[in-house]
Amino acid sequence: IGVSHGEDGTVLIDDQFAPLTPKIQAAVAALGASPVKFLINTHWHGDHSGGNENFGKAGAVIMAHDNVRVRMATDQKTPFGEVKASPKVALPVITYAEGLKLHLNGEEVRVISVPPAHTDGDSVVHWTKSNVIHMGDLFFHKMSYPFVDRSSGGDVRGVIAAADKVLAMANDQTKIIPGHGAVASKADLQAYRDMLVAIVGKVEAAVKAGKSLEEVKAMKPADGFGVNPSGFITADRFVEMVYGTFKPA
């Protein structure tokens, strides 16, 4: 979650699951901030947009990529089960294809769309003055291998491209907020990007060599990168996602 506040109002980036709304509102108030005026969803998944209905009813203006509204407005099937359409009040009311800029609290906040990556509706949020970048689930920082939701139009090659885009925007003082894990640096993101390139390269080469999924998993191409092996997405699960990119079922 990212929060920016000041005389122009409070901006919240992502809102987790609905039951957490009171805790989020309390944390915002503890910062001395006014109630959330603007809410940006980095993508449609429920752990980032589940509080939309609550914040929408409380008067927040919700913004997201065009495809976030499309997916939230219709029933979706994911690797973790079916997700029912959200009520109207939970849907983004301002949507965009390429991104937008907010001029609030003395900041230019750039909301940047990226090509299909974690999903087909990912956004990066860049506070240019504060030198802070929120990447949503384009970046999983060490607590798990990344989740590439191919059922939502995701593509691991897009995750690498998004990392490259953010690396070009960042410097050594930039604070990078991942979708999961601790706040990171440009060096952390570079290591993540290099890990993805290495794993994807190994898996793609193995697919071209005719190896089966089980043979590729036995190669352990995702091991040795310092990622929590028992996280939300395990090494084997991530290899399956990458394998499916190059050899769809």
Question: Where do the PLM segments sit?
Answer:
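Divalent metal-coordination and catalytic microenvironments
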Residues: 4, 14, 28, 43, ...
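Active-site-proximal loop/helix segments of hydrolase catalytic cores
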Residues: 108-170, 184
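C-terminal regulatory/interaction regions
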Residues: 208-249
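Metallo-beta-lactamase
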Residues: 69-114, 119-120, 129, 163, ...
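Active-site neighborhood of phospho(di)ester-bond hydrolases with catalytic His/Asp-centered motifs
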Residues: 13-15, 37-45, 63-66, 134-136, ...
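Active-site metal-binding motif and surrounding structural segment of the metallo-beta-lactamase
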Residues: 7-11, 19-63
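Divalent-metal (often Zn2+) His-rich catalytic cores of metallo-beta-lactamase-fold enzymes
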Residues: 132, 157-211, 215, 219
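Conserved beta-strand hairpin/beta-sheet module of binuclear metal-dependent hydrolase folds
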Residues: 1-28, 125-127, 131-135
